[in-house]
Amino acid sequence: MKNKIISVNNLVKNYGNFQAVKGISFDVYEGEIFGLLGPNGAGKSTTLEIIETLRDKTSGEITVCGMDLDKEPDNIKKVIGVQLQSSGYYPGLKLTELINLFCGLYNTKVDPHEMLSLVNLTLSKEDRARLKDPNLDKAEKQKLMDKDKAGAKYKELSGGQKQRFSIATTLINKPKIIFLDEPTTGLDPQARRNLWELIKDIRNQGATVIITTHYMDEAEQLCDRIAILDEGKIISLDSPDKMIDDLLNSGFERTKQVKAANLEDVFIHLTGREMRDE
């Protein structure tokens, strides 16, 4: 079995008399894509922010890469990458300028073009060399130039390109763990699937990925294991396939059967409500 990279034990978060997270416990293992699913207000984003050291917990124990959250929050920040929302970027700066800005915050140096090529926002070294070939067909040259967004300003990007860029910034410090909070919200179906492939590539390169999502198909496609949260509690934790099999074995049948069941059926069966994307 792979090593635990995150361990959460009896985590509680109170806001006055309201308990947003109610004593949840779970582990995340090296190299997996782990999903936190739940309706709005379930506690998934709060849980993520606590692990990211962005929000204080009320009680409970958390370790990240063997480090105690209470004792080594600064060291934990060095091994994680956190996706910012679009409001966290200067819209008038070029992508290369933004990458260099984040390098300064992390006190590290990377080649902006190499970083952007990881998320398909600029040309690879091979394509940049092809662009200099005097014999390159004009149509092919234009196609390559259109692909290169390194010199574009952030505000000029499409929604999918902005999401890919935000993921690029999480990779600058070569983190062991990447946190993605609703990474495909608002994207069209093709842009969502492109981002899924990027997330899988990042995992395949050795990172562990923690994701929150409203989309059942996304969790089913991406996640090795998921925890379903409802009203601050974990009500199920397993692989998507195992959850679906357990539901079918309980005698569940769809009213209109296309497939026997999917992950969305599991969620509605457990929580009694459909997911809301507000």
Segments the model singles out, each with a brief description of its role:
Residues 130-135, 153-157:
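Conserved ABC ATPase signature
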Residues 174:
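Conserved catalytic motifs of ABC-family nucleotide-binding domains
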Residues 178-181:
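Catalytic Walker B motif of ABC-type/P-loop ATPase nucleotide-binding domains
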Residues 219-221:
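A short, surface-exposed alpha-helical micro-motif characterized by mixed small hydrophobic
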Residues 237-238:
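ABC ATPase "signature
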